[in-house]
Amino acid sequence: MKIPANILLAAVALCLCGCVDCGAFRDLDYADRAELPRLDALALDSDGSAIYGQVLVPSSKFERPRPCAIICHGFAGFTRWDDVAHDLCRAGIVVVTPHHRGAWGSEGDYTVSGCIRDAENLAAWAMSQETSSKYGIDPQAVYLVGHSMGGNSVVNAAARDVRIRGVALIAPCDIGYMAERMTKKNLTAFLVGEGLHVLHRKSDEAVVDDILANACAMRFVNAAKSVGGRKVFLATGDYDSVVPSEPLDALWRLLPYDPKRHVRMRYRADHSLMGVRRALAHALAGFILEK
């Protein structure tokens, strides 16, 4: 039996009301092997570098076409989002979890501007006729989701490609704002402290110089006009000590008042959003499934 989108959204709403293990987030009963969800390997050429990851495909019980969420990791990628990805897949969303160029086995040299290009290329791939047909993706319902530096990747990628339906920013890092307020030495120290050494890169200085060269262009406020007419989800932790809140508040003030398309969530959590992941997943699924 196919699950219509309106019934699915109602189930998500029930979850949001407090029943965290019900509705769209429960594991289904599969009477036939053909109904099973599946995990596919991702190997996508992004400007000449192969980026690897996974594609989580919902059960065939969910109606086609389905929305797609591409989850971009932060810097340097230690904080995983597999739990949220699987919850979104259980709700009938195709989920792509890539590793950026130069990170966690993907080819190429890591740069922040390269991550933006990866997000652009991933969105274009998801919206292509071949991919959308293979996975049952609605090419008009592709969302970019980014945590921390991944937020920088997705908001800037969405600003460049108006076909992207919406963005979800989870404790996003406006690295352009931060770079404009730090010395090169302090910016380098910040990145080293966050795990720069685990990334494949030409040099530490190359990563820092890339940020400094693109700092102004990457500022979140510069993306507000482009993304403001689309769906925007912003989630932050009250105890976040990694990224400043000022540029996030500035972005939010620039978005037109539209509570149906623009969703602001605050959680009693730190930068990783640990401890509130289930509530976050429910809110994010509701945001993506809302027409």
Locations of regions flagged by a protein language model:
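Alpha/beta-hydrolase fold nucleophile elbow
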Residues: 134-148
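The serine-hydrolase catalytic nucleophile loop
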Residues: 75-87, 246
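Serine-hydrolase catalytic core
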Residues: 207-282
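N-terminal cap/lid segment of alpha/beta-hydrolase-fold proteins
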Residues: 22-62
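Conserved alpha/beta-hydrolase
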Residues: 89-107
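Alpha/beta-hydrolase active-site loop
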Residues: 110-136
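Active-site glycine-rich loops that stabilize anionic/oxyanionic intermediates
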Residues: 66, 72-77
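Hydrolase active-site cap/lid region
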Residues: 156-207
